[in-house]
Amino acid sequence: MADDPSAADRNVEIWKIKKLIKSLEAARGNGTSMISLIIPPKDQISRVAKMLADEFGTASNIKSRVNRLSVLGAITSVQQRLKLYNKVPPNGLVVYCGTIVTEEGKEKKVNIDFEPFKPINTSLYLCDNKFHTEALTALLSDDSKFGFIVIDGSGALFGTLQGNTREVLHKFTVDLPKKHGRGGQSALRFARLRMEKRHNYVRKVAETAVQLFISGDKVNVAGLVLAGSADFKTELSQSDMFDQRLQSKVLKLVDISYGGENGFNQAIELSTEVLSNVKFIQEKKLIGRYFDEISQDTGKYCFGVEDTLKALEMGAVEILIVYENLDIMRYVLHCQGTEEEKILYLTPEQEKDKSHFTDKETGQEHELIESMPLLEWFANNYKKFGATLEIVTDKSQEGSQFVKGFGGIGGILRYRVDFQGMEYQGGDDEFFDLDDY
């Protein structure tokens, strides 16, 4: 995950788009004054400008005065945004403009335009009471998806792994006769029945695989991993009943000691090299490397907001690791009496304590200059500190441990740093303040 800085930057871009989608999906407006415009890479700005001029003419006929004015206002905003571009950027252009209604019931104008992190091959123009983000969501879900078939003597499980998400698509159990010494003339008949049931089982698995992993005549996964404890997986991979299109996608056969969901987890673990570009594995590796630094006590690690920010300021952080749902806010306050700026990092619990926002001596309230989630601030500023930012989930065991045990924020350092020996002036202040340093 960290070996390729461009991949890490791309992950930050993906996180930003996920965050944007979340806020756009939640936004609602009155009437149809919210415009979603997506221009694919090879389109012409002039064509879109003409289309908008035509739309402006059509919108002038809307009967409701309020709706007419807000739609015309939104179209004008989009036209203004387009004037900033001579041509469509290489990856296309996404524009959202309109008036939304906030939770307090106030109206607020939204104007967003950006080039996505990879080509968006969708053309879209919609006026509605909400923003349409389906094309952006599709852009994110284009990560490689891998199929897993876990097959043993007691049943089969079909699943997929995409990015950090694993999903069980289907599973069924089977009751196959065991080999036994019941004998005499019946031995051959028993063996024949066994082979027949086994054959039918493999056929059922092969047919189910086609239903799940082939859609519209095409294989819908980037690769397949066959896993199992007996030789069923080998039998399936070599069987004539197994669809040729799927056969060509088999990446690996994996021996596992369990069936079902435990087997699925084990199969993911054992296919690591094959799926090394899947984020789930990369995340485990990255946090594993972080834990190694800690267990070997190399001193090349930091955790918690305070130490991590100290290390960033020193330029010591090579990889900054942050949990995607980190709920710490960064506040920049202006102290009225001293005219100094103060920076606080507070959890939702600490935010409730209003004493953080007032002067201890005078009781005067500090002026709020800026507030934003700390992760968002990192996403905008990590390059200034020469670090790579990795945004992780708590879906893997390591990720969950990182969030619960280390607060979801830490870093792998370029060199050993002794945080104990770096006492701050005003060490009694429990909040880390960059200006004190």
From Swiss-Prot:
Positions where N-acetylalanine occurs in the chain: A2
Example of a GO biological process term: nuclear-transcribed mRNA catabolic process, nonsense-mediated decay
Localisation per UniProt entry: Cytoplasm
Entry keyword Phosphoprotein: yes
Impact noted for substituting K63 to A/R: Loss of hydroxylation
Numbered residues of crosslink Glycyl lysine isopeptide (Lys-Gly) (interchain with G-Cter in ubiquitin): K279
GO molecular function: peptidyl-tRNA hydrolase activity; ribosome binding; RNA binding; sequence-specific mRNA binding; translation release factor activity; translation release factor activity, codon specific; translation termination factor activity
SMART domains named among the record's database cross-references: eRF1_1
Principal place of residence: cytoplasm
Name the UniProt record assigns to this protein: Eukaryotic peptide chain release factor subunit 1
Organism: Homo sapiens (Human)
Protein encoded by which gene: ETF1
